């Protein structure tokens, strides 16, 4: 049975009824599912796996950091190339769930195969890298690309789930449910053998698939009028023309620039925090898992809190508050000499991470006209994913060039993200004047 998404025509009886309607709950469970992938693969076990395969001392740990950074950057590069087309596909076909399903299944299969090849005893090397390791890195790039591609369609789907007043709460609920997925994902950790992080890949793929099923089966999109078919490359031409309309959409583009730099700091930190905590601050694997759980609880609390802050103060101020919190968290992490200070930084980063998705998704919906929403979400992803190339490339290059300095190289790399956060905050402050003019 599929349920039509038409909450706008219903009178909700309080927030409980809003959150636990089957369409919205099914939508939120996909956040639950993809967060399992994000936390288990992107943040924890893939970095652990590379450190196990490459890192043997402080110098080689920096090389492992470079591999992690560059793999993330390559996945983001492909997303940059395709995300503008995805936005145009949404506007012209009106179909989102179809592509979410296809992209999710590809990501699930690649994640499963990471587990197969991660434990395979292959001999020989490919481009100077052990064959099994090279295959796992390639599969990670593909899995991450399709995971992020599905989110372009998923985020756009939110605009059909409620009224303008309800969207901040729906967004916050989705993010909070998503981070509960982290807790479920990490439940596999006690069953992973020491030094065998690849054992986490197959269970993660299964969990990702299982918790995606509610969206696949119980959520039906509202019918949308399809636009006339255009040549394949016309999508890029339309994106180019949209950039030329910058004067007409100054608020949108200014926010995308701000998001570019803030997301740079966030995306890079997500990919590197596990190795940084272990090699620089001295956390054990189990110690970092506990830290990540605390950070996740902070994300859940922050996403709910900032849903209400966004509703009461407006999304621009809410995003600004999140940016300041992120800046402070990065500063503490760079200069932390003890685990205690890194616990503080991790908790603050958790709040800012969950809250950034809540506030930014709501803000872009508020700023964009209905007929351009899919296209602007594509550009929104474009801005974020270009930054997801630059941040990891910068981080990985710093650790590569200065690897002889040991852990100081990682502190320098993380310190570069402070500059990005400051620039992003600067553009957010500029938006106050633009809002008054508009």
Language model region names:
Residues 81-95, 301-314, 399:
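Helix-to-loop junctions at the C-terminal end of transmembrane segments
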């Amino acid at each position: 049975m599929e349920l039509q998404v038409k909450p706008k025509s219903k009178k909700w009886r309080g927030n409980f009824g809003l959150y636990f309607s089957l369409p919205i709950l099914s939508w939120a469970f996909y956040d639950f599912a993809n967060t399992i992938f994000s936390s288990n693969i992107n943040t924890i076990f893939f970095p652990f796996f590379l450190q196990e395969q490459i890192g043997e001392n402080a110098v080689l740990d920096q090389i492992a950091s470079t591999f992690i950074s560059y793999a993330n950057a390559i996945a983001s590069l492909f997303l940059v190339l395709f995300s503008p087309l995805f936005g145009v596909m949404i506007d012209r076909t009106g179909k989102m769930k179809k592509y979410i399903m296809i992209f999710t299944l590809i990501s699930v299969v690649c994640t499963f195969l990471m587990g197969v090849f991660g434990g395979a005893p292959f001999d020989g090397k490919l481009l100077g890298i052990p064959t099994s390791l090279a295959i796992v890195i390639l599969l990670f790039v593909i899995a991450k690309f399709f995971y992020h591609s599905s989110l372009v369609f998923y985020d756009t789907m939110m605009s059909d789930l409620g009224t303008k007043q309800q969207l901040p709460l729906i967004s916050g609920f989705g993010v909070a449910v998503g981070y509960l997925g982290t807790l479920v994902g990490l439940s596999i950790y006690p069953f992973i053998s020491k030094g065998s992080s690849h054992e986490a890949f197959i269970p993660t793929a299964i969990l990702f698939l299982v918790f995606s099923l509610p969206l696949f089966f119980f959520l039906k999109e509202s019918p949308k009028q399809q636009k006339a078919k255009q040549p394949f490359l016309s999508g890029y031409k339309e994106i180019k023309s949209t950039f030329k309309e910058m004067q007409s959409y100054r608020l949108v583009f200014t926010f995308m620039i701000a998001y570019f730099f803030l997301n740079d700091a966030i995306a890079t930190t997500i990919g590197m925090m596990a190795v940084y905590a272990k090699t620089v601050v001295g956390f054990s694997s189990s110690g970092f898992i506990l830290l990540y759980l605390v950070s996740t609880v902070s994300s859940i609390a922050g996403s709910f809190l900032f849903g209400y802050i966004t509703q009461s103060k407006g999304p621009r101020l809410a995003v600004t508050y999140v940016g300041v919190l992120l800046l402070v968290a990065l500063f503490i992490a760079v200069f932390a000499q003890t685990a205690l200070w890194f616990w503080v930084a991790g908790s603050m980063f958790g709040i800012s991470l969950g809250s950034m998705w809540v506030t930014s998704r709501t803000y872009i919906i508020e700023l964009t006209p209905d007929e351009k929403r899919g296209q602007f979400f594509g550009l929104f992803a474009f801005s974020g994913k270009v930054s997801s190339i630059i941040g990891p490339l910068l981080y990985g290059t710093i650790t590569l060039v200065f690897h002889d300095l040991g852990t100081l190289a990682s502190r320098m790399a993380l310190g570069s993200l402070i500059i990005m956060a400051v620039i992003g905050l600067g553009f957010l402050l500029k938006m106050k004047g633009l809002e008054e003019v508009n």
